[in-house]
From Swiss-Prot:
UniProt-listed Pfam families: Intron_maturas2, MatK_N
Protein name per UniProt: Maturase K
GO CC, alphabetical: chloroplast
GO BP, sorted A to Z: mRNA processing; RNA splicing; tRNA processing
Residues annotated as signal peptide: none
Keyword Transmembrane included in the entry's annotation: no
Recorded family membership: Belongs to the intron maturase 2 family. MatK subfamily.
Length: 506
């Protein structure tokens, strides 16, 4: 990311922190091209030797300012193949340019905030998906109620642009961004549909994720502000917090509104044990106190989304459940708090007492049914979990087939090694192992029994079960009791930055 700092310093020396001139700089598109964000979008089929042209991008931006930018004469089309109708291709080119330009200043703010907080070395571990589970193990065993909330959408992109204006002061840049969204992404309708959002997110994934994250960051900043105002203890876990234009004015307005209209209700929101976790398009709100406080926070969220972001959310879609009686889905796992009861005999002088001790433990379980559904969708088994062959891979060599199955098995084992019960994970491994055997038997045009006799059933494909033990034996002492104990306990890996489709099938 050193290129970001160089390009922003170059732009500062010319245009006083404005982002608009960066749209017309060739190194911006070269940066997107070299990082392989989407290499195919910079390639035109005719006459460009697999290279993009900044001149064509500038011409397209110029035509965006014209009312008849889609009316292209036949002469222009004959002279230059660029002006043939290929709306999606060049909208993606400009979308990459927008995403790169607008990410530059915020990445620098993020890196400076991390350096000031002295957590730059552990930032990669914090980014890991598995980093949230140790937090849940430490905190959720002391909580009683949980609310699983789906962040509402669709939201009109005009609102996202207005949110972005709180951070950046470049008016021409936002004017061009609005033109791009309205002319190329079909955002002329007043209420966007889920289909239009899905189309835009697939054709412009980087820009869409950036704008969506701004929407989430905005409502979370307000939520954190309300949470801090409702209790005298300051929140210290959010050390990375950006300064925004007009934020203090907005905050003073919120203080005035809540002190005027909610002076008697705010003391009831003093809940020091409320915890908030966001993942993908959902968030979890957990608390130790009575459901009354959770219900108040639920309506806080609903009114915040409806009044501040014009996003409709139904109160009945947010349920409040007891942790001991409810399982919630989190990043491909089923999680709940289990009550462990034990009886201890205590003796005092001549009297003996039986004391019942109740302890809580967070259970994180592999969701076997969604995983089997994902394997069936990928044609590794049927809907009942019976392994089937993969004839599409039959043209590959035996080594490639085994390596493909091992890679899938290794990734699933790596991701689900934090499960408290490994039986479901072993079942998934067994399905993949038999599917691999059936695929090889199908390739060699023989039955499974004949193929196993020929290759040796005792030693064939033992890597499906022995690879994990070999890795653990390199990390921990070669003691059978130690390895058995680590098989029973959870192991979280802090190098997992994303989940694949098999994990994320909800």
């Amino acid at each position: 990311m050193k290129e970001y700092r160089v390009y922003l310093e170059r732009a500062r020396s010319r245009q006083q922190d404005f982002l608009y001139p960066l749209i017309f700089r060739e190194y911006i598109y070269g940066l997107a091209y070299s990082h392989n964000f989407n290499r195919s979008i910079f390639v035109e089929n005719g006459g460009y030797d697999n290279k993009y042209s900044l001149l064509n991008v500038k011409r397209l931006i110029t035509r965006m300012y014209q009312q008849n930018h889609l009316i292209i004469s036949a002469n222009d089309s004959n002279k230059n193949p660029f002006w043939g109708y290929n709306k999606n291709l060049y909208s993606q080119i400009i979308s990459e340019g927008f995403a790169i330009v607008v990410e530059i200043p915020f990445f620098l703010q993020l890196s400076s905030s991390l350096e000031e907080a002295e957590i730059i070395k552990s930032y990669k571990n914090v980014r890991s998906i598995h980093s949230v589970f140790p937090f849940l193990e430490d905190k959720f065993t002391y909580l009683n109620y949980v609310s699983d909330i789906r962040i509402p959408y669709p939201i009109h992109l005009e609102i996202l642009v207005q949110i972005l204006r709180y951070w950046v002061k470049d008016v021409p840049f936002f004017h061009l961004l609005r033109l791009f969204l309205y002319h190329f992404c079909n955002w002329n309708c007043f209420i966007p549909t889920k289909k239009s959002i899905s189309t835009f997110s697939k054709s412009n994934p980087r820009l869409f994720l950036f704008l969506y994250n701004f929407y989430v960051c905005e409502y979370e900043s307000i939520f954190l502000f309300l949470r801090n105002k409702s209790y005298h203890l300051r929140l210290k876990s959010f050390s990375v917090f950006f300064e925004r234009i007009f934020f203090y004015a907005k905050r003073e307005h919120l203080v005035e509104v809540f002190s005027k209209d909610f002076s008697y209700t705010l003391p009831f929101f003093k809940d020091p044990n409320i915890h908030y976790v966001r993942y993908q398009g959902k968030c979890i709100l957990a608390s130790k106190n009575v459901p009354f406080l959770m219900n108040k926070w639920k309506y806080y969220f609903i009114h915040l989304w409806q009044c501040f972001f014009d996003v409709w959310s139904q109160p009945r879609t947010i349920n409040i459940n007891q942790l001991s009686e409810h399982s919630f889905q989190l990043l491909g796992y089923f999680s709940n708090v289990r009550l462990n009861r034990s009886v201890v005999r205590s003796q005092m002088l001549q009297n003996t007492f039986l004391i019942e001790i109740v302890s809580k433990k967070l259970d994180i379980i592999v969701p076997i049914i969604p995983l089997i559904r994902s394997l069936a969708k990928a044609k590794f088994c049927n809907v009942l979990g019976h392994p089937i062959s993969k004839p599409v891979w039959a043209d590959s060599s035996d080594f490639d087939i085994i390596e493909r199955f091992l890679r899938i098995c290794r990734n699933l084992s790596h991701y689900y090694n934090g499960s408290s019960k490994k039986k479901s994970l072993y079942r998934i491994k067994y399905i993949l192992r038999l599917s691999c055997i059936k695929t090889l038997a199908c390739k060699h045009k023989s039955t499974v029994r004949t193929f196993l006799k020929r290759s040796g059933s005792e030693e064939f494909l033992e890597e499906f079960f022995t690879e994990e033990e070999e890795i653990l034996s390199l990390i921990f002492p070669r003691d059978s009791f130690t390895l058995h104990r680590f098989h029973r306990n959870r192991i979280w890996y802090l190098d997992i930055l994303f989940s694949n489709d098999l994990v994320n099938d909800e």
